[in-house]
Regions:
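Ferredoxin-reductase
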Residues: 2-84, 132-134, 157
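FNR/FR-type flavoprotein reductase catalytic core
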Residues: 72-220
Length: 220
């Protein structure tokens, strides 16, 4: 029998046309960057699906941010209403390096969730290189704008006016390495090909594996 908790959804926020943040009363303590497993009764995926927490540990409500990709779990979660209950696990995972070094987040789309949780909770110098298809698909817009994180946005599809903090196309990992402190710790999160590509380029740029934490998102 699975060991699950019941969490009531108390707030919903539409991040963009296909992405929803679900807030629920936090039934556990957690470390920034951890994730939970969501279970669906009757699903053939009995082990559930993992979702990173997009909230900070000190906040009263916990949250997950879900992009509707048409799969069983994303469709289910993106159709929930306030008052519905989720069956979830406790938080787990060790993505957070818990270091005093400067932190550099490299993320694509919703994979920002665990990196945002870590950077927003950090007291040291923080950087974020964030790739999304276009500005209207950016998640956590208000929170990012109000944060002290040094952010560079990269729009991979829609053409944007290149101004401070905004760029067209994909980021250059070698340039990122040159721009940030030499002792920085890197947090990389995205699809498996994205994470593998960034990891390889960090390694080629002389960044040791002990200074890189990775998390892979699988869409479902």
């Amino acid at each position: 029998m699975r060991d699950s908790l019941t969490a009531e959804i108390v707030r919903l926020r539409q991040e963009n046309s296909d992405t929803l943040t679900l807030y629920f009363v936090r039934p556990f303590d957690f470390v920034a960057g951890q994730y939970i497993t969501v279970f669906i009764d009757g699903s053939s995926v009995r082990e559930g699906k993992a979702y990173s927490l997009s909230s900070r540990p000190q906040e009263e409500l916990a949250s997950i941010t879900v992009k509707n990709v048409g799969g069983e779990f994303s469709k289910y979660l993106c159709s929930r209403q306030v008052g519905d209950c989720l069956q979830i696990s406790r938080a787990y995972g060790s993505f957070n390096p818990q270091t005093d070094r400067p932190l550099v987040g490299i993320a694509a789309g919703c994979a920002l969730s665990p990196i945002w949780s870590i950077l927003a909770d950090a007291e040291q110098l923080t950087f974020l290189y964030f790739s999304h298809t276009s500005p209207e698909y950016q998640v956590f817009q208000d929170e990012l704008a109000a944060s002290n994180i040094k952010i560079q946005h990269f729009s991979t599809s829609a053409k944007v006016e290149e101004k401070k903090g905004w760029h067209n196309g994909r980021f250059d990992v070698a340039k990122i390495i040159a721009e940030v402190p030499s002792d920085a710790h890197f947090l990389v999160c995205g699809s498996l090909p994205f994470v593998r590509d960034v990891w390889q380029k960090l390694s080629a740029g002389g960044v040791g594996g002990e200074r890189v934490s990775t998390e892979t998102f699988f869409e479902q």
